[in-house]
């Protein structure tokens, strides 16, 4: 019966346990321990119905993303927790706070970016921490704080770690295995492994380490099994795949006996790619430091910042230290800052900083030094021997206070000064809106002055402005002042006080002045208005000039159009040509024979006569009448008058050419008549001369330059002549040709006789011009037929 009751009780307990097991999980009750196995079940989160008495929990191979505080709450008996091969990217702080019995935590093959200081809080008995194959880029300094003394196995391989909390690693005295391979580590702090006496395996493969700090722990890698103890086991050390810089700093590692030959050097250039254990010890050398650049001298006003630079090269890279003038090593403090590149910043300088600063560059091969001379220009202060000479209530650091107490004292820098006060030695002159000339004088009995200091400020504020002036100057121009403002100014003399070994200062004098008022805005507005007025005036002048020019052109155009019909009428009246073949011309308009129509009392336009006279010579040698137009244009351009161009005329013809001949012939006859009327002898000579060359003159004509002698004559009381043109053989030949047609001939071959009608225009030629025209054609070619 008792046996039956015991079996039923055991079955009931097993049924209760199975009933509490999460879905898709397997729960095992092994004696006193309870295991919950949920590997690769496709879980997206930690099942909430897990028995809190679980000792072993396996959740690997799922898709869990987040770990919260309630996921493992009250699991105080949990010893082994496996969260491998999930997609965990975030662990809420204090999520493992209740897992005080946990011995092993597997977080490998997840997506954790970092480990915060509270991520692993509460794991006080943790011995195995596996966090490999994640995306860890950083680990907080206190992340391992709760299990530093209990941790035995730490695996951080295959991450993106650039550094580790080396101080925490140094305190893991029970650590047996440390896997840091396949990371981005480039530095290991010296002395990190000094206390890790139980370390049996150290893996630093495939990092960026260029050197390893010498440590006695690495000597255990050569210890045999006979000499090994449980407290000092032999060390398995791997550091292949690192770009080792093979210099004197790795000589200690080269002297170790190793069995593998796979390590190679990454630098320097002469040893790059060579097997580490095959390189001779003599080739592991270093270069002493060399300072390449540093500050030589520096002048700083007391209280201001100073920057001292020092750069050095060497192999390995040297460390730079600074030594103050009092042989004190300068470090980082509230007043100074030392940087890794060798720069020293003094944030606030004092008089004690004056002197030589020493830059020391040191490495494993030696050291180099350089000196920087720092000079501090001290702020003015009174020494004990000169304090009684200062005016009452005058303070060197507050000129405004000293000057405001004496506003009614005539502009002095203090109250009622004694008779020998130095304020009178300062004069301010040539005051403008933005500048003033300050002059001062010092008595010959004064100590040797090193420098003068000019202090001034505006009466509207309390900001002092300092100007350092060499001792050789006794005047200074103060610029960049504000217009219409009062200023308080003092001049101080600085010299070395042998009693206090400090720079003593005494007031030479003080003064007050006001700058002149200025109105830049009004002047600017006036200049703008003046500039705009000038632009308007110039534009108006240009527009008026253009309008006047346009009006002149329009008036001239109208005058030309008005005169053109009159010119054409004059040309029509004065150029009446007819070809009669030697016969008498018929009556004009029914008028009696021998009587010509009276032309209107006009003077023929002068430019038309010029056209005929200047183109005459060219027309005689041309075979076409088109050359006459070009001769007219040339004669007009060479004339002495620039008359408006005549109205368009019809194309020149043979009749117009004959009119030119007649004009020249009538001119010569007119001249002969004038000569005959003066002297009897002249009449006979004129008659003979007229019969000799009057017919040849029109053909030759005077040169075109004689066209300026043309003058209009009145039409009344002048004889009118008519000449007939006889074609001679030309007409007979034309009639004899069959069909009344004859081959064309040159016009020059038929100019034998002509008939011209000219009214009132004579060409006054000189006698010598007529003589020059003789001999070209015979007088037989020209026959005067009739004269009316």
Swiss-Prot record:
Residues 21-534 are extracellular. It holds the Pfam family fn3. PROSITE patterns: FN3 (PS50853), IG_LIKE (PS50835), LRR (PS51450). Keywords: Cell membrane, Disulfide bond, Glycoprotein, Immunoglobulin domain, Leucine-rich repeat, Membrane, Postsynaptic cell membrane, Repeat, Signal, Synapse, Transmembrane, Transmembrane helix. Residues 642-651 have a biased composition (Pro residues). Residues 1-20 form the signal peptide. It is a single-pass type I membrane protein. Forms heteromeric complexes with LRFN1, LRFN3 and LRFN4. Can form homomeric complexes, but not across cell junctions. Can form heteromeric complexes with LRFN5. Interacts with DLG1, DLG3 and DLG4; interaction with DLG4 is mediated by the PDZ-binding domain. Also interacts with DLG2. Interacts with 2 NMDA receptor subunits GRIN1 and GRIN2A. This is Leucine-rich repeat and fibronectin type-III domain-containing protein 2. It comes from Rattus norvegicus (Rat). The lineage of its organism: Eukaryota, Metazoa, Chordata, Craniata, Vertebrata.
């Amino acid at each position: 019966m008792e046996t039956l009751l015991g079996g039923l009780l055991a079955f009931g307990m097993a049924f209760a346990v199975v009933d509490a097991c999460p879905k898709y999980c397997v729960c095992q009750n092994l004696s006193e321990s309870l295991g919950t196995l949920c590997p690769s079940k496709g879980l997206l989160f930690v099942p909430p119905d897990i028995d809190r008495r679980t000792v072993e929990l396996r959740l690997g191979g799922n898709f869990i993303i987040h770990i919260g505080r309630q996921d493992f709450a009250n699991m105080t008996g949990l010893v082994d927790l496996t969260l491998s091969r999930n997609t965990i990217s975030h662990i809420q702080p204090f999520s493992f706070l209740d897992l005080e019995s946990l011995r092993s935590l597997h977080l490998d093959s997840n997506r954790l970016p970092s480990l915060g200081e509270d991520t692993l809080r509460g794991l006080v008995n943790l011995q195995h921490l596996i966090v490999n194959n994640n995306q860890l880029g950083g680990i907080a300094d206190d992340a391992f704080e709760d299990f530093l003394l209990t941790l035995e196995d730490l695996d951080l391989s295959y991450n993106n770690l650039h550094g580790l909390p080396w101080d925490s690693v140094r305190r893991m005295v029970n650590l047996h295995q440390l896997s840091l391979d396949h990371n981005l580590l480039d530095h290991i702090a010296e002395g990190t492994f000094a206390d890790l006496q139980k370390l049996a395996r150290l893996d630093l493969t495939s990092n960026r380490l260029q050197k390893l700090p010498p440590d006695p722990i690495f000597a255990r890698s050569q210890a045999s099994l006979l000499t090994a103890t449980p407290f000092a086991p032999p060390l398995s050390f791997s550091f292949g795949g690192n770009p080792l810089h093979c210099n004197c700093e790795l000589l200690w590692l080269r002297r170790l006996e190793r069995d593998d030959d796979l390590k190679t050097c990454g630098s320097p250039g002469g040893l790059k790619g060579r097997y580490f254990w095959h390189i001779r010890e003599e080739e592991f050398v270093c270069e002493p430091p060399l300072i390449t650049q540093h500050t030589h001298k520096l002048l700083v006003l007391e209280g201001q910042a100073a920057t001292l630079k020092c750069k050095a090269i060497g192999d390995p890279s040297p460390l730079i230290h600074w030594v103050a003038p009092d042989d004190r090593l300068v470090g980082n403090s509230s007043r100074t800052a030392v940087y890794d590149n060798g720069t020293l910043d003094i944030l606030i300088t004092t008089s004690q900083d004056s002197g030589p600063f020493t830059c020391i560059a040191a490495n494993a091969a030696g050291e180099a030094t350089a000196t920087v001379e720092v000079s501090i220009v001290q702020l003015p202060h009174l020494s004990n021997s000169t304090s009684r000479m200062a005016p009452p209530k005058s303070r060197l650091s507050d000129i405004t206070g000293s000057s405001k107490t004496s506003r009614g004292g005539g502009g002095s820098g203090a109250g009622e000064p004694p008779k020998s006060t130095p304020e009178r030695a300062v004069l301010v002159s040539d005051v403008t809106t933005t500048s003033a000339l300050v002059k001062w004088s010092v008595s010959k009995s004064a100590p040797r002055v090193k420098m003068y200091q000019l202090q001034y400020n505006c009466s509207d504020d309390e900001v002092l402005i300092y100007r350092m002036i060499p001792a050789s100057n006794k005047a200074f121009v103060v610029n960049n002042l504000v217009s219409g403002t009062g200023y308080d100014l003092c001049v101080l003399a600085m010299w070395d006080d042998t009693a206090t070994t400090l720079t003593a200062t005494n007031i030479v004098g003080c003064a007050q002045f006001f700058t002149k008022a200025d109105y830049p805005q009004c002047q600017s507005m006036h200049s703008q208005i003046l500039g705009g007025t000038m632009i308007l005036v110039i534009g108006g002048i240009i527009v008026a000039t253009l309008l006047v020019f346009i009006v002149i052109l329009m008036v001239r155009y109208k005058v030309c159009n008005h005169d053109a019909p009159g010119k054409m009428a004059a040309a029509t009246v004065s150029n009446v040509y007819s070809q009669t073949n030697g016969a008498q011309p018929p009556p004009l308009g029914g008028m009696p024979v021998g009587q010509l129509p009276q032309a209107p009392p006009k003077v023929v336009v002068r430019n038309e006569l010029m056209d005929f006279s200047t183109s005459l010579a060219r027309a005689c040698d041309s075979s076409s009448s088109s050359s006459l137009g070009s001769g007219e244009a040339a004669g007009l351009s060479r004339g002495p008058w620039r008359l408006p161009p005549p109205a368009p005329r019809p194309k020149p013809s043979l009749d117009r050419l004959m009119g030119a001949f007649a004009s020249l012939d009538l001119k010569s006859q007119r001249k002969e008549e004038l000569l005959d009327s003066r002297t009897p002898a002249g009449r006979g000579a004129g008659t003979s001369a007229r019969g000799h060359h009057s017919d040849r003159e029109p053909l030759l004509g005077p040169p075109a330059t004689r066209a300026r002698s043309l003058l209009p004559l009145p039409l009344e009381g002048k004889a009118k002549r008519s000449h007939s043109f006889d074609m001679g053989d030309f007409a007979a030949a034309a009639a004899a040709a069959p069909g009344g047609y004859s081959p064309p001939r040159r016009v020059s071959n038929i100019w034998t006789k002509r008939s011209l009608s000219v009214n009132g225009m004579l060409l006054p030629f000189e006698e010598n011009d007529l003589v020059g025209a003789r001999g070209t054609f015979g007088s037989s070619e020209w026959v005067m037929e009739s004269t009316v």
